[in-house]
Amino acid sequence: MKVSVVVCTYSMERYESFSETVESVLAQTYEPLELVIVVDGNEEEFDRVQDDFGDIDDVVLHCNDENRGISYSRTKGAELGTGDVVAMIDDDATAEPDWIETLVDTYENNPDAVAVGGTVVPDWVARKPEFFPEEFYWLVGCDERGFGEHMEEVRNTYGSNISFKRDVFLEVGGYDTNTGRKGDKHVQAHEAPVCIRIYEQTGERVIYNKQARVNHKLFEYRTEFDWLVFRSFWQGYSKRVMDLLYPQASDDKNAYLKDLMLVYVVDRLKNLVEDPSLAQVQQLIAIFVFTAAVGFGYVYGLLTPNLVEKTNN
């Protein structure tokens, strides 16, 4: 089973991190494997990529003619790849050496599997802020508290650790370009739509193998309270876009909100009474602030006319 790993990048500012991502893929224990690098419209970066990685076997390079966003770029990478499976990883993450081997084992042990994902663990470049609750790690693309059980079928895992049978992925059209980061647009949640379409076509969800591990770098700006509130707002906006495009996705969102308020917040309140600390108070406050920001973003989406058209332009 050949695997194509797609890495998309767009900025020289993250080139060092991107290079570490590439090296972690090239160091995988599994073969046969090819690496597909898609540079999203940055000619300067593409020249550097060609110099650094262009002469390595089983590395495919491509530069988009302009910045087209993460959804287009990842789909393009899958089209350029030749593997039976296509795996995605962010350009600010590093994979454990057995990442691909673990994903492939899951496919081989589950003949009906069409998508397999793994754990995305925070790699704190700066110190982890005490106020940041694990329930909201999803804001930074990492597995949050209660995300899923080992080998459970889930709607989707996060974009830095997800793989698909390549033919199925392309058959459903790949990622929806109405979603996902593009330039200065902040629409998130591009993983869910393709997984929903795959489920509707095949009846199969994503198998979550917690042993397939990717470490996601969290730079200092991603740990700032204001940035996380901003991110929460745009996540709420993105959820409104998702409701319009894929109303069937709302069940997972509602289940998460129910668990957050009725299970995790209650559990935190009990712990606060039994063993009070400043960090626990800060995290409780953050939960309510982030939740409110998500709500405001959703309402902003409700009030935005022609929302989907504006998102795609």
From Swiss-Prot:
CDD domains: Glyco_tranf_GTA_type. The chain crosses the membrane at residues 284-304. Pathway: Cell surface structure biogenesis; S-layer biogenesis. It is a single-pass membrane protein. The keyword Disulfide bond does not apply. It is found in: Cell membrane. GO terms for biological process: S-layer organization. The keyword RNA-binding does not apply. It catalyses: an archaeal dolichyl alpha-D-glucosyl phosphate + UDP-alpha-D-glucuronate = an archaeal dolichyl beta-D-glucuronosyl-(1->4)-alpha-D-glucosyl phosphate + UDP + H(+). GO terms for molecular function: glycosyltransferase activity. One of its GO terms (cellular component) is plasma membrane. Disruption phenotype: Mutants contain only hexose-modified phosphodolichols and exhibit defective or limited motility. Its EC number is 2.4.1.356. Keywords: Cell membrane, Glycosyltransferase, Membrane, Transferase, Transmembrane, Transmembrane helix. Involved in the protein N-glycosylation pathway responsible for the assembly and attachment of an N-linked pentasaccharide that decorates the S-layer glycoprotein and flagellins. Catalyzes the transfer of a glucuronate residue (GlcA) to a glucose residue already bound to a dolichol phosphate (DolP), a compound that serves as a glycan lipid carrier in Archaea. In vitro, is able to add GlcA to DolP-Glc in which the omega-position isoprene is not saturated. However, the likely physiological lipid substrate is alpha,omega-saturated. Belongs to the glycosyltransferase 2 family. NCBIfam families: GtaseAglG_Halo. This is Glucosyl-dolichyl phosphate glucuronosyltransferase. It comes from Haloferax volcanii (strain ATCC 29605 / DSM 3757 / JCM 8879 / NBRC 14742 / NCIMB 2012 / VKM B-1768 / DS2) (Halobacterium volcanii). The gene is aglG.
